[in-house]
């Protein structure tokens, strides 16, 4: 039961809320022509008003239809039930909505007021009137006449007048039918853009006016209603003569606007139509179509001849806002032209607003009587204002003329409710005459007024009135109870019992006060405390004895005066502040908050720091603490002091609190790497390392604390193809993939260490150099790589000094070797033939060479030469190949001219592709000034030693030998002699760094001299024989020195560097051979050439003495036992013919001695590269070195004499010197043995690949030499006694089978750091002549890989 009652109450409240929300609308649908007393709807149910119980209302619910006096309503409503019924008035849609377009709905609206005021609502009810088929379609005339020319084509169509049906929709015209057409004509129905159906007559057979000139039939029209209605008309077709051109309107659709107050006769529009015919057939007749409404025909006139449309009667937009005029233009034919004229009648403010007053409160003699105590918002009447104008002209506002306690509240468009806006007072105003004004927004505006009268009924509505509206009283705290404060009084305008007043304390009065009921005296009954309550605000009531009684109130404000009875109170007994250590001096540390319950000066607190602490200050008023010092958490982490608070009372009170300031760490330290210690350290990573192995660990520390000291690691650059990964917490660098040959070399990994500090994280970076190789044997070289790599920018996935392995370049080397060898053999053969025929032209060619240009790179641009693997194998042309021929010959003791066992080492190498970096002569700046001399053409020496004077040993008329006087020092440093553009500048302008660490190595060279023995080197004086220099190197059985006589066992090493490209530095000779200029030599020449066709040059075109051209006069070294035979050709007269004045200042240039450049194919015929040592070795001075070291010296030879070098060893440390050359020559490999080892060099053969066999017994320095045997017939013989204690000599059964992974360079520590970069030695295969271990009399033969 409770649940049901609760639901009912909720529904009632919901209904009240709905009704309280404002006006409502309700829509109903009715059909036209409905009979009387038909139930339309029930508002009580439709608006859910049945949920409101009648017992909660003051009066019963009523429904009142609000309509204008004089109107005949189409509906009525039952006042008690809210049911809506039809009345006896006819509901005719066509009449009610005559002015509404046919395609719009027809509505009828009424308003219903729901009473009483508790639930008052004004409901607007809209009735949608549905059309019924109560009208039949009718033709405009019962007889329709139409003319058709006799030559009309079959299926020609002629428009017939359309029928009109006042009904709409399906009840309108739907179909046309032709009756008794005799199959001559047919009928078609088309729909116009306006939605009207137009009948068209179709000619189905040929017409002949002479045979029959008139056809009579019937046309029937039907609607779609139920029941269906129809009508017929007689159609008379007249066959006329031919008129084959129809009129054509210039514009078929015209829209015009005309104001509704336009006078009669005003032109609306001018129609223009043309006809291509002539004569009578071209005369156009204008007429309205029968579809034009009668109203339009009444208002507009169409001139049949000119087509001018004018106003026939005054227009009224309120009656019809627009008109559609369908105009036909006919030339007498059956196909008139059609044009639609849309006339929009614009509004003119010509209608005065109307005011319609519909009373909700029943008036008495047109006067509404209201009680003065009626509630606010009491609805009095519904005011409706209308204006027939449109837009702003029809926008009406309604208002009253002066201030009254009533207002107009809009509920619908142009409808207002008159209701009370204030309480009525009979004593002030007893009657109201309200003037209502309605005005539109036109220019000028039109207005209308109406009067409404209201009388006020008197009631007991006066309450007592206090003489003071606000009472203020003050009293000190700690008072005595019973003190009287004040007296209040009030008056009442009423009389009698209604004027008798009683005083009462209001419900908000505190218990500390009491009030006398009759006198109004206010008294304090308790002791007051201002700290508990500093003021009291309450009301005092004055109540009369009326029925019902009326009351009024006055507000009393009691203020408590403060006394200093409280000490200052800190918000905390102890304050702890946390400040960052980087807080600036005098920054804000914190705020001390102190309260004092007292008021005024008693609560004015002053703060100070006790104990005279000068480290901090405190604002005495705000309590802000600021430091006078700079914090450093590492020195002191906290500070403690006391703060005193003292109030400003007459007798002051104080208190104190402890303050502790804690210094908090800030992220002011970057992580610092301790491992690796610097960017120059490196770590070895073996290529065989398994993926997932930790290859290195970086360690960084942060001096901060907490999260500011937490370090995270990441790789931010230099990680080639993600080969490495790093653990962000431990710093362990892990190898992610298996290393292949492409990964060998130095990897520069950029590691970033950042802390987790907030708000900004700090970081540091370090370069971790990871060297991927089998071992670290040349630390100096790696350090140099690392040093130079620091100068290169670090980009993502950067690999520094990529080391190409023999395995990855094996195919490339083989292709280069085959192509180079075959090409050089063919070119040398052709060149040998051609050069024999070109001797007369060489002089002119030499002069042309003087005009060659020399380029000089900037020595300041030191760049790390990056050796990167080629993505594609280039086709090696002969000009990119250089063949190094090394002939090591052993002369029989009994026959110095014997050609016995010889081994020729043919060393093909593509230095441009595999070894030497290309120098960019376009982008590299030079140090030349525009007006400076060409220092590249001179070789000025800064050495204090005098230049050598070469004494010729052959006649001066020899045209194959040119000797230049060169200084002792190396004043020329070049990048490489076989690159595309070899540097040929002097030292101050030369390239400062020509090293290629990844592909070269070098060995220090020192000469061990002894006191004079039996053999000395003969001085270089003119003689018929070759000049010979003998150098004693290690003890041998005493033999008589016989020069080149029998019984003298010696080892000859001859180096020949035939020119392989246009960039080669060696000269190809000067022309045909002169027999008289040659010295006697007994050994075979390289590539099997005849002696007379092989030419050498004493000084290559781009070399100086420092590059290996030792002066022949420096060959006198006294006290040498063994000798290296050096044949020096005499100089020629042309040596100084071309010298200029600049030569006296800057030194001799190439123009003094260099011949003109020859054809590259022919110049490769007989090139010989001079193998020279640095200045100390090329001079004639005697140098004494430590006994264990025995070196072999490579000295320059002058062409065409083949030079020989005797290779000897000292007893305990069997060491072989490096055939070392200063740049840009390609240096020979070093055959080195560590001192404790008395082992010989091992010449090992690796069958699988043409790899270089390691010729070394020093484990930390595994040098590799790669040698190829030439395809020519030359050979080199190795004496078994060449090395003593040859325990390590490898035979076939002891060959190194695993040499496929050997490198033909080393990365270990450089043995000679002061020298320039180490040069490349090409690959060579050593093969024994026999399968067995060679005996003492046999020597292994070094053969080229059989490609």
UniProtKB/Swiss-Prot annotation:
It is found in: Cell membrane. The chain crosses the membrane at residues 813-833. Glycans are attached at residues 27, 48, 54, 344, 553, 773. One of its GO terms (molecular function) is calcium ion binding. GO terms for biological process: homophilic cell adhesion via plasma membrane adhesion molecules. Residues 24-812 are extracellular. Keywords: Calcium, Cell adhesion, Cell membrane, Glycoprotein, Membrane, Repeat, Signal, Transmembrane, Transmembrane helix. Residues 1-23 form the signal peptide. One of its GO terms (cellular component) is plasma membrane. Gene3D superfamilies: Cadherins. Potential calcium-dependent cell-adhesion protein. InterPro entries: Cadherin-like_dom, Cadherin-like_sf, Cadherin_CS, Cadherin_N, Protocadherin. Its main location: membrane. Residues 1031-1050, 1057-1091, 1097-1116, 1325-1347 are annotated as: Disordered. This is Protocadherin-11 X-linked. Residues 834-1347 are cytoplasmic.
